[in-house]
């Protein structure tokens, strides 16, 4: 005690010591009407008197920036309006200095869309095949959903909710192994177990053609590209059929050594993506000029998946971007630049990826999965953050199809149910106008040159 | 050819068929009970039922 006081006396000229001495004196002579200099923040006072007005003139452009500025001001204790202080508040100062900034979330510019967690409709799908390599569900642009249940193809009109049977295939030819609508939504291709493909006019409900000779085993994948119908078979072959020509086979793509289970044309119709049971994805180039060589080499070959690739989806807002999903032994979603052949990203999902769909209005990707959760997962692209997980199916969700307006997704699983999910939300008005205009087009039944 | 994506799972139809043989119920009558693409209603979906488009 004596040493401390003598030490303080010895350094009386030190400003810090003077500060303490003055503070002690001020405590003894406390007055409500005289400002307490030791309690005042002179730096803040100087700032408030000189630059404070300047800040008021500034206009904050966006809500998120305003929220950020508010949070920053609170963290730096700049929200005070008073300059003079009449009492020394050491506890308040200490707590203010050491307290954590508030954890409130900044105001988001875009409110998150509500995604219903339950399917809005459940339809019975008795006899649907629980086969990973088939493609038994498709939603046409005329708002008719086609589904193959065993030997029979059913059409469900989404506008009216009515169901009707299109065709029951003979036992020797069936069962149905794939279906795919033409771009105008008026004709349906039906792939069969006996390697044939039937073409049906769904306006008059009659068969117009049978394609033969392209494959030696069942046709599990189909993809239309205007008047070209591409078929993928259990024999690993991919055949381009021009349905206007009597001898329809115009091209054969050889590259897969096992069953072709995924087949998708890009929106421009210039590139074809194929996935197979050999764990390989091929990108093929479609040239309109017929060449002398009917067999063509692939553009790219992706071998990074470690299981069968059935899920393929071309990105609608970024040309040349392809999303692929691997089966049980892989469980990954990969993104490819099909111009350069580079793998841009790979995301582990934790289970078999059966199907993939891009949103038409937002940068989102929907995936359907198998064992153990049998869920649909909605991802935000490109961060690949999970936005929603949709449960309800009790078996692997093999098939997904998107409505023409882009809002609703139909999913079918081995639990023999067809579920409709309002997962992508309401479309923008412009998109809706464009969509409705497409259907009312008087020449919709005529093939357009694109 | 290896079927690497095969999962053997008993569907409801298979389970019913198995049950019908045990109980001696006629399979034709059993099949008629299910409506193709018929609406399956449950409690959680009734409130959310809405028209498409």
Curated annotation (Swiss-Prot), chain A:
Pathway(s) annotated for this protein in UniProt: Protein modification; protein ubiquitination
UniProt main location, coarse: nucleus
Gene3D superfamilies, alphabetized: YVTN repeat-like/Quinoprotein amine dehydrogenase
InterPro entries the record matches: Cdc20/Fizzy, WD40/YVTN_repeat-like_dom_sf, WD40_CDC20-Fz, WD40_repeat_CS, WD40_repeat_dom_sf, WD40_rpt
GO cellular component terms given for this protein: Cul4-RING E3 ubiquitin ligase complex; nucleus
Compartment(s): Nucleus
MF (Gene Ontology): anaphase-promoting complex binding; kinase binding; ubiquitin-protein transferase activator activity
PROSITE patterns in UniProt: WD_REPEATS_1 (PS00678), WD_REPEATS_2 (PS50082), WD_REPEATS_REGION (PS50294)
Keywords of this entry: Cell cycle, Cell division, Mitosis, Nucleus, Repeat, Ubl conjugation pathway, WD repeat
WD repeats: 129-166, 171-210, 214-251, 255-294, 304-346, 348-389, 392-431
Function comment: Component of the anaphase promoting complex/cyclosome (APC/C), a cell cycle-regulated E3 ubiquitin-protein ligase complex that controls progression through mitosis and the G1 phase of the cell cycle.
Assigned protein family: Belongs to the WD repeat CDC20/Fizzy family.
Subunit structure: The APC/C is composed of at least 11 subunits that stay tightly associated throughout the cell cycle. Binds to GIG1 and PYM. Part of the mitotic checkpoint complex (MCC); interacts with MAD2 and BUB1.
Name of the protein this chain belongs to: Cell division cycle 20.5, cofactor of APC complex
Source taxonomy: Eukaryota, Viridiplantae, Streptophyta, Embryophyta, Tracheophyta
Gene that this polypeptide is encoded by: CDC20-5
